[in-house]
Amino acid sequence: MGRLLGVGLLGDRWRSWGERLLALRNRLKASREVESVDLPNCHLIKGIEAGADDIDILPNGLAFFSVGLKCPGLHSFSPDKPGGILMMDLKKENPRALELRISRGFNLASFNPHGISTFIDSDDTVYLFVVNHPEFKNTVEIFKFEEEENSLLHLKTIKHELLPSVNDIIAVGPAHFYATNDHYFSDPFLKYLETYLNLHWANVVYYSPDEVKVVAEGFDAANGINISPDKKYIYVADILAHEIHVLEKHPNMNLTQLKVLKLDTLVDNLSIDPSSGDILVGCHPNGQKLFIYDPNNPPSSEVLRIQNILCEKPTVTTVYANNGSVLQGSSVASVYDRKLLIGTLYHRALYCEL
């Protein structure tokens, strides 16, 4: 009888594991294929060969790229080369990506940039916030951008127990930001278990020199984050839940959920079109291809435009889609004056004139 009970319990456990694996495949959209939506006047950006996970563009047309991200278990085309920050002047006729110099004293060898955000202070000082994973740890670096020298002056490294697995960031002050944690744990194995068990322990944290606090939680895997043009709302992408959350920002910097937009793709980073307030989303149509890399069946790319996200039925349009033959694993799309930049997790980056 004891053996029969043991076999029964083992069978239940295997059934539970099987159900969880099936659920994970569904969260990864493992069977989805994408139909191409091409754009004219596009070319790959020279000098970006191993990913440009995030892009942020200043009002004057200077675009910043975080390049060379490496994550445990994720493919890399340049595994031994440290990451960096590139800049492109979109006001120029034929813009090129140039790497910014970083001030002495900053550890360039372990630089592993992820999400980025800019903040312009009242005196026109430009700060660049960078999520960094040196040796796969979690920090936020604050730089001052020195335009005349094409350089970044490192000001501060931020570490905190409430920032265990930082993914993206939106700056709201010279030393103030909201950040997403895509996992509750920092250990790679515990992260895997957290994802496999679908625990929904990811969150959003507000950081200031005076206060650090969790302001939203219950996400499957909180990823991209941005702010509305009127600064009233925070947008958060939940990549494995295929959702964009709209959260209302309060004077004490707390957030309350206003609505959730469900999509049929894995939503990564979010950018705002400054001319319209529309949200541009870099997406992964098939997450399994992203994490299990096959050069003969590479991950595809998809960019969505979301108009009027606050209304009952926002308009969602596919701006660009590719099966991986041109661009693999799109993670971000940013626009400036009818010029579109599309970055990827670990592949190339695309420049298009709309």
Curated annotation (Swiss-Prot):
An example of a Gene Ontology BP annotation on this entry?
response to toxic substance
Localization per Swiss-Prot or TrEMBL: Membrane
The catalysed reaction is: a phenyl acetate + H2O = a phenol + acetate + H(+); an N-acyl-L-homoserine lactone + H2O = an N-acyl-L-homoserine + H(+)
How does the entry describe its membrane topology? Peripheral membrane protein
Q: How is it modified after translation?
A: Glycosylated.
Residues with an annotated glycan are: N254, N269, N323
Q: What EC number(s) are associated with this protein in UniProt? A: 3.1.1.2, 3.1.1.81
Q: Quaternary structure per UniProt?
A: Homotrimer.
Question: Per its record, how is this protein called by name?
Answer: Serum paraoxonase/arylesterase 2
Gene responsible for this protein: PON2
